[in-house]
Amino acid sequence: MARDEHDSRYLTAELPGTGGLFKETPEDFLVEEISLYLPCGEGEHTYAVIEKRGITTLEAIRRLCRATGAPERDTGYAGMKDARGITRQTVSLPRVTPAEVMGLNIPGIRILSADRHRNKLRLGHLAGNRFRLRLRETVPDAADRARAILDVLARRGVPNRFGEQRYGIQGNSHLVGRAMLAGDWRGAVDLLMGDPAKVEGERWRAAIEAYRQGDLAGSLSLFPGHCRTERDVLQRLAKRPDDFERAVHGVHPRLKKLYLSACQSALFDRVLETRLQTIDHVMEGDLAWKHDNGACFLVTDAKAEAPRAERFEISPTGPLFGCRMTSPEGEPAALEKSILDAAGLTPAAFNLAGGLRMEGERRPLRVPLEGPELSCEEEDLVLRFSLPRGSYATAVLREVMKRPGNGA
């Protein structure tokens, strides 16, 4: 489940990429949520459209809650966004007036609008995302190359991979999740503390080395203040040095869910890699995804369903494994079982206590690319397109750029 295993193949392998650099400045990456609905104008929650820069969604929520006094547990958001780039998204704040929100002045956050609504905004309550991406230092014929690749993606679909941004700054969030699912709590703590080769700053590296040498107090004193998770875990471990499970449960519940979700994502990506060249075809035994309503059905006659797949009405699905996930049959089922077995997990492993139970669901192996546009601005190549909720622009960039290690 190492990261490089997810970056080995392309759907458009026969087409050369643009190369180039991405995310050199925040303005290179702009994402705007496409809302499912607008606030109704009444209720105890304020829906605020924010523009955040250089901070994660969770950090934006922390800052909003500190500024308004709203409890984090009652604050809602539709989608998780990372720190790099500029994001426009909606968050809901309980028992705070729109006027109070509009009057906020918070570093890294600009309030664009605020209105009342009756209920908390829930994860997944968005139609999709619009992206504007700027690529720098591309090859001279980058526009022609990108156009050819986008044409294929528009016809065959975008591989619905999660990709490396799902695995955290050190690229091991999925491994933390797998250790938790396997009940390897010491392994989870070791991974949480990090790898000194993957962090910046002598103090941070020294903190990790101190932990590895068993010096918990020394490690705690060295970890920088922004390493909140590591410090919380160490504080618990210092009180009970052998209780690694208790230490892991010092992690914020949202973060624990993220680690588990990252493991699900890595396993899905592995299935996708195996089926990459046939993501626009269904096979017998598949659970096919209906793009008009998100329902799934068992494919019993692949030949009969082929025209619907060609029209992009349906697509094969892959697993977000869980204790109650519906499994396919036949060859697709055998493939998915082999990948779960290789990870040393079973469906029952996802039935965790403490609000961490992962029931599982199906996810389409491909998604439609909506409204792709290309433009050349000075010496840069600018891409614009939309994707459904839960799908990532990096899946498009990876095909377009074909350069490892550039964030795509």
Swiss-Prot record:
Domain TRUD: 157-367
E.C. designation(s): 5.4.99.27
GO MF term (any one): tRNA pseudouridine(13) synthase activity
Descriptive protein name: tRNA pseudouridine synthase D
PROSITE patterns, sorted: TRUD, UPF0024
Enzyme class of the recorded protein, top EC level: isomerase
UniProt-listed PANTHER family: TRNA PSEUDOURIDINE SYNTHASE D (PTHR47811:SF1)
HAMAP family per UniProt: TruD (MF_01082)
Keywords: Isomerase, tRNA processing
Family annotation (InterPro entries): PsdUridine_synth_cat_dom_sf, PsdUridine_synth_TruD, PsdUridine_synth_TruD_CS, PsdUridine_synth_TruD_insert, TruD_catalytic, TruD_pseudoU_synthase
Lineage: Bacteria, Pseudomonadati, Thermodesulfobacteriota, Desulfuromonadia, Geobacterales
Keyword tRNA processing: yes
GO BP of this protein: pseudouridine synthesis; tRNA pseudouridine synthesis
Record bears the keyword Acyltransferase: no
Active site: 82 (nucleophile)
Similarity comment: family membership: Belongs to the pseudouridine synthase TruD family.
Catalytic activities: uridine(13) in tRNA = pseudouridine(13) in tRNA
Protein function: Responsible for synthesis of pseudouridine from uracil-13 in transfer RNAs.
